[in-house]
Amino acid sequence: MKQYNAIKVKYPDALLLFRVGDFYETFGQDAIKTAKILGIILTKRGAGSSSETELAGFPHHSLNTYLPKLVKSGLRVAICDQLEDPKLTKNIVKRGVTELITPGLAIIDEVLSPKTNNFLAAISLGKQIGISFLDVSTGEFLVSQGTKEEVDKLLQNFNPSEILVSKQKKESFSSQFSYPYQLFYLEDWVFQHDFSIESLCTHFKTKNLKGFGIENLNDGVIAAGAIMHYLSETQHQKINHITFLKRIPKEDYVWMDRFTTRNLELFYSNNLNAVTLIDVIDKTISPMGGRLLKRWLAFPLKDINEISKRHEVVKFLMEDLNSLNQIQHHVKLIGDIERLISKVATFKISPREVIHLKNSLEAIIPIKSIAEKSINTSVKEIGLNLSNCDELRKRIKETLLENSPVNILKGNSISSDYSDELKELRRIAFSGKEVLDKMLTRESEATGITSLKIASNNVFGYYIEVRNTHKDKVPEHWIRKQTLVNAERYITEELKEYESKILGAEEKIMALEIEIFNNLVQWLGKFIKEVQNNSFLIAKLDCLSGFSQLAIENNYCMPLIDDSYELDIKEGRHPVIEKQLKAHESYISNDVFLDSDKQQIIMITGPNMSGKSAILRQTAIIVLMAQMGSFVPAKSVRMGWFDKIFTRVGASDNISMGESTFMVEMNETASILNNISGRSLILLDEIGRGTSTYDGISIAWAISEFLHDNISKPKTLFATHYHELNEMTSSFKRIKNFNVSVKEEKNDVLFLRKLVPGGSEHSFGIHVAKMAGMPNQVLKKAHMILKKLEKSHSNEELTGKVKSIKEDHQLQFFNLDNPILEELKEEILNIDINSLTPVEALLKLSELKKKIDN
């Protein structure tokens, strides 16, 4: 245990798998955890002695079965292997940790999800917050820096499996980022700028980082350097597939804070078994395409030209169904070449996976041919940039057998035609039947024993078996090996020599196959960038083909995007809700029009369950889908591009931070109001409902007024129960009232789910309570109370008070009866601003301020 303890002390945070012969063993607390997670037997080592300790283990060949379960449980697992052949040493076998598997550094297929990246992140808390992401399974390495809100958003989009943070900044990180991330703390010296630059330049073999366009991202570079250090610390030395460090160009993408991503349920939902947007729009076929689609959804584009290029490809493939079908057919034959080529770099690839890589690259050839002939410029460009990888495919075909096994140690991976030496060794090893038949015939004739049999087993090797009735005919030079009830087994010098020859050939075959395969994998490393480029192009084409398939299946339209400030949606639908309707049901579509001049804010009133929230969400989703390059669920859409999408929809507590539902709502709304622009789309649902009625109306009114009067004029949909807000349209020219209509029939209400002009006077909350099965006694009492409240608190009374506050505020502001204010007014009016220099203007402003202060 001395050797084990010496290694374990170096990896106190990891579960240590200690190789002992044919088993991986765990001891002590590690054994208790292992037995519980894997469901294997927990035993004792040295039971009853002073060195007694828990023990649990499994066969070494079962590592790929058990390791994923340990990593998925959130453990860091250190694999300690035997570094020398036990047969060649008389001392304790030398052992060492060959790899440290962590949640963020997993390249095991059983741990990874095909259409989801597995990112490791590092965060540097400096002047700005630096952040870097690495998916070691694909080689994608990204860097950025920014504010807390920007980094928070990136964390939600990339959803890292593990985050590296400085030990000294532990509390600072926890106070800013409250989500339950898997964290690992590194020493503070790792997060140094010079150290990071040196680490990155050493890996990329460059003198500086200017070629990556990140030299000004000091905090981002520090985060990226921390990741490189972590790779080294965890024994990940073979990382040639990490070929580039890319800046995340935040200015190119639509800004959506983490609340918006959550509220729109793009990737996740708080409701169990709920369908998300990605579930509906993902028509990709390849793993690479699935991963890229998630990136496109998280980062919609702002550049009209780039968006239009995607739309044109989708349109082209919809019109050329033959090309679409052919492309999708061949993409199905392509495996995850991005992760396969990463396995080449890390030497974790199997013979069967190399064959899979070759077959996948062969499936690219017809795709390249189709794309090159395309009349669409973007598709043609993809075709021209795809590589046939002729040399790579040829070498694999010459070297490996098509039915190569998963493990090189199983043998029969290398083609005999590739090596004359291998061919000869196989002839010796596998032509044994012919040799043994000749030997059997010769010995039978010499002894006169017709029932002789030559066979072998793992214990005695080859032998000649003679039944007892003929054992008196056995020659003296035969050597007895084993006695059975009815027979005797012998060996001869000739048979012994032959056995030695066969066993020697089999060992040499195995060694030669391993050598040839390792040389092949090393040679394949030259094509990493070429295959990675193919992977990206196929992923891109897969996404666009998926958009075409999506539009065909669901009758989506091509949105028209321009530089205007309008949003004009005709018969828009919610893509997720419409897919969940029953066969006989149809989705009630709705029109939405917003601009900066006449209809900047739409105030939507209507009953509970009438569909207000759905209209808000579908508007945002249509804009988002349009700017990610997809067609959209509507009859037509014409829109100016948006740079920010904000949503405040739904309610949730943040108990861990001590925040109520109302506080969370106010935080999210404040974030929106502090970050709006002229190209923002804002969706607000039931703002102010978490407090008293008067507080709620006051807050909702003030927010609406702020948005209306703001110079940016952000386009806004505001769904509310406060019917008093309908009065705002008379005072604010760009606020228009709409309601989600209902039809009252006797004591029943029919939700029509249609957005129509005009405000609504009723919420029908009691009717919804009735639908929920509320007792009649409660419903009757509620109805009586409602009638009394409606009489005592009329809309006119409430809105009159709000309007008078606004008018009083304006009168007070412009009341200039005060002599000092009158003097200031005259002085300001007499200033010739055209002749003032900037410095003189500042001095004049300072002078006026002093007069007011005095």
Describe each region flagged by the PLM.
Residues M1, L17, G28, H60-L67, ...:
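Amphipathic alpha-helical transducer elements in NTP-driven molecular machines
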Residues M1-F316, N325, H329-K332, D336-A345, ...:
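Charged catalytic and DNA/RNA-contacting regions of genome-maintenance
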Residues P12, G28-Q29, L217, I285-S286, ...:
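ATPase nucleotide-binding head domains, primarily ABC-like/P-loop NTPase cores
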Residues P103-L112, K238, I375-S378, D437-I449, ...:
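Active-site phosphate-binding and catalytic loops of NTP-dependent enzymes
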Residues F191-S199, W255, L266-Y268, N359-E434, ...:
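Amphipathic heptad-repeat alpha-helical coiled-coil/stalk segments that mediate oligomerization
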Residues T346, S350, S360-A363, S416-D417, ...:
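Charged, surface-exposed helical/loop "interaction arms" that form contiguous linear patches used
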Residues L401, L484, E488-V521:
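Extended, charged coiled-coil "arm/hinge" scaffolds of SMC/Rad50-like chromosome-maintenance ATPases
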Residues N457, L829-N854:
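Terminal-proximal interaction/regulatory segments of ATP-powered molecular machines
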